């Protein structure tokens, strides 16, 4: 049961899906799209970035805020990256393979391509691009998908280069890895047609299925990201970036709606109280020269303790806007953009070693009355000043309602401030890459891939898989291998489609749960396994042990692993003699049980030959010997 009536609240929501493409080379250079261990980096360099003007002479507001603090950006490079990632060389022509994949995706979403594609520069000064901008190209628009709530529009599809991966922050320095920078990706933006949190998840799942249906997108953590745009009738558009898991989408939207409703309540309360934000910044460093508070002692040593006076704000700074997050947390997020650790406010004091007497002294010093709130920041003078200015600005916005922001998704479903929403000044033309013609003939030549849902149906009808197994293999990363193997063993009595599918999506996960690194298994390992089963060199019961052995020692070939495990081909005469001996030694038991003795006897035989002889063969041989004994008796 949903907490809110989203239709009544006027919820508008849309998604932006960023999906890496599985091309051999990067978008604007010929480097491979390999993700490297940062320890393999063979050199590094650093940059300082600043906001630049667009072709209209304007600076993007988000870029301006992000460059208020001078940060040092350190880049880790590899023998698989080049001067283009370093921004020391102009880009090459756009990757044709990536363009073909992107056009195929556009077709799946019923989109119309542009006649002429122009590459643009999108200003990004968070350090994730060495150049200070990301190259992006608008490719298609005006598409749709069908959902349980009606059609959901697909407004745009852009081809972009992936950003560098943030490794860590050390003080005012941020370290990035260049292995990811420049990997091709598509950005797919829906229309604001999403009607509820559950509908958002449905749309995201369907878009993800369409993308995986191409067989040409990367898989795994970090290869797909969802941004969510949310607003309600009296609220504002907020872009929430970096939703990694589908499970989080519903919570993100629910909690953003809750945040906006609580902020609207706070606004109304402030209006009724006739609240006011004082512009003056108060230097109260001298009041804490002898403080026992360790956090304030550090601030005094750094140089400044500054304060802001918010009239009639008392009790509201500490009001919860999302579970575990308050209006004061929103103030703190803004302050942190200046490089400080956070803020103190009187709704949570005395605390942190700050005494009631010290709070009263501060109130008296700046003229704060009962019912007023005081915000304090302790840090280096310039950082503290920028931080307190940011808090004053956010407090003013609290009186107006909800600011338009870009926020980051947190693991618990809450969100935190990142920067203002970017404006039109963020984009300007890329002059180093020529325009690309997209003719109707070219677009028509792009094949539409079969959807995974359709493949699953085909696996049921043509290959005899049950529905659950068909869906698992269709959505598995092993899908291409499965299709290759069923083509090879289509008429093989020993290797059928069900055995192949169960091995890939049933046995492999079971081995992984036992702590075995199944990522070490290659397609060649699986192919060798099924060759051995087809030739009756091993039994089906040996699959799990053999795959576990190959995963632990991936340098072994399948025949070598079979030999090491003692799973060599069986001698039919030896097996027949063992079965006869087993039957003779249990004559009384067989006379008592008759044909029902087959099960217990099978357990004895399987214990001897499990993994060496196929259970079906053992069962047939034992039944034949048992029937012969009973008939003679």
Swiss-Prot record:
Reactions performed catalytically: L-glutamyl-tRNA(Gln) + L-glutamine + ATP + H2O = L-glutaminyl-tRNA(Gln) + L-glutamate + ADP + phosphate + H(+)
Record key words, sorted: ATP-binding, Ligase, Nucleotide-binding, Protein biosynthesis
Entry's Gene Ontology molecular function annotations: aminoacyl-tRNA ligase activity; ATP binding; glutaminyl-tRNA synthase (glutamine-hydrolyzing) activity
EC code: 6.3.5.-
GO annotation (BP), single: translation
Record-linked InterPro entries: Asn/Gln-tRNA_amidoTrfase_suB/E (IPR017959), Asn/Gln-tRNA_Trfase_suB/E_cat (IPR006075), Asn/Gln_amidotransferase (IPR018027), Asn/Gln_tRNA_amidoTrase-B-like (IPR003789), GAD-like_sf (IPR004115), GAD_dom (IPR029351), GatB_C_1 (IPR042114), GatB_Yqey_C_2 (IPR023168)
Entry's Gene Ontology cellular component terms: cytoplasm
Any one Pfam family match given in the protein's UniProt record, by short name: GatB_Yqey
Similarity comment: Belongs to the GatB/GatE family. GatE subfamily.
HAMAP family in UniProt: GatE (MF_00588)
Subunit structure: Heterodimer of GatD and GatE.
Function, in words: Allows the formation of correctly charged Gln-tRNA(Gln) through the transamidation of misacylated Glu-tRNA(Gln) in organisms which lack glutaminyl-tRNA synthetase. The reaction takes place in the presence of glutamine and ATP through an activated gamma-phospho-Glu-tRNA(Gln). The GatDE system is specific for glutamate and does not act on aspartate.
UniProt protein name: Glutamyl-tRNA(Gln) amidotransferase subunit E
Gene: gatE
């Amino acid at each position: 049961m949903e907490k809110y009536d989203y239709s009544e609240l006027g919820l508008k929501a849309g998604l932006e899906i960023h999906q890496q493409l599985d091309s051999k080379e990067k978008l604007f250079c010929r480097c491979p799209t390999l993700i490297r261990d940062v320890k393999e980096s063979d050199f590094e360099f650093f940059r300082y970035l600043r906001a630049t003007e667009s072709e209209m002479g304007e600076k993007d507001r988000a870029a301006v805020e992000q460059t208020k603090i001078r940060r040092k950006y350190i880049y880790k490079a590899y023998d698989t990256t080049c001067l283009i990632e370093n921004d020391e060389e102009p880009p090459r022509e756009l990757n044709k393979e990536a363009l073909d994949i992107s056009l195929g995706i556009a077709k799946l979403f019923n989109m119309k391509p542009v006649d002429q594609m122009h590459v643009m520069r999108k200003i990004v000064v968070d350090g994730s691009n060495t150049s200070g901008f990301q190259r992006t190209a608008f490719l298609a628009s005006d598409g749709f998908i069908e959902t349980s709530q009606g059609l959901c529009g697909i407004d745009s599809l852009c081809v972009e280069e992936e950003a560098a991966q943030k490794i860590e922050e050390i003080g005012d320095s941020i370290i990035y890895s260049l292995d990811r920078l420049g990997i091709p990706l598509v950005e797919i933006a829906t229309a604001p047609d999403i009607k509820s949190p559950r509908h958002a998840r449905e749309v995201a799942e369907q878009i993800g299925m369409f993308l995986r249906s191409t067989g040409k997108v990367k898989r795994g953590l970090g290869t797909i990201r969802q941004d969510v745009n949310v607003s309600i009738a009296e609220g504002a558009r907020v872009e929430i970036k970096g939703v990694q898991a589908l499970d989080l989408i519903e919570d993100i939207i629910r909690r953003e709606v809750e945040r906006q409703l609580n902020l609207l309540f706070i606004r109304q309360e402030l209006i009724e109280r006739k609240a006011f934000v004082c512009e003056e910044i108060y230097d109260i460093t001298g009041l804490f020269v002898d403080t026992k508070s360790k956090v304030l002692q550090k601030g005094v040593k750094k140089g400044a303790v500054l304060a802001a006076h918010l009239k009639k704000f008392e009790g509201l700074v500490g009001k919860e806007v999302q579970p575990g997050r308050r209006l004061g947390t929103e103030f703190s997020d803004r302050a942190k953009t200046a490089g400080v650790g956070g803020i103190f406010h009187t709704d949570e004091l005395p605390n942190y070693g700050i005494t009631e007497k010290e709070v009263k002294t501060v109130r008296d010093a700046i003229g704060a009355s009962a019912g007023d709130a005081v915000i304090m920041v302790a840090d280096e003078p310039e950082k503290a000043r920028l931080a307190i200015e940011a808090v004053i600005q956010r407090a003013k916005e609290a009186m107006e309602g909800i600011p338009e922001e870009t926020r980051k998704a947190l693991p618990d479903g809450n969100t935190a401030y990142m920067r203002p929403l970017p404006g039109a000044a963020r984009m300007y033309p890329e002059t180093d890459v020529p325009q690309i013609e997209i003719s109707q003939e070219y677009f028509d030549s792009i094949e539409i891939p079969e959807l995974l849902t359709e493949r699953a149906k085909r696996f049921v009808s043509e290959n005899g898989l049950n529905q659950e197994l068909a869906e698992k293999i269709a959505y598995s990363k092993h899908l291409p291998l499965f299709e290759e193997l069923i083509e090879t063993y289509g008429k093989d009595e020993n290797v059928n489609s069900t055995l192949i599918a169960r091995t890939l999506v049933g046995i492999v996960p079971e081995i992984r749960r036992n702590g075995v690194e199944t990522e070490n298994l290659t397609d060649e390992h699986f192919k060798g396994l099924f060759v051995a089963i087809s030739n009756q060199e091993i039994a089906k019961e040996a699959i799990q042990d053999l795959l576990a052995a190959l995963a632990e020692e991936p340098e072994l070939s399948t025949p070598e692993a079979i030999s090491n495990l003692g799973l060599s081909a069986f001698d039919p005469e030896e097996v027949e003699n063992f079965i006869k001996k087993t039957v003779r030694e249990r004559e009384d038991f067989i006379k008592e049980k008759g044909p029902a003795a087959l099960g217990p006897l099978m357990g004895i035989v399987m214990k001897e030959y499990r993994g060496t002889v196929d259970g079906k063969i053992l069962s047939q041989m034992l039944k034949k010997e048992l029937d012969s004994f009973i008939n003679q008796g």
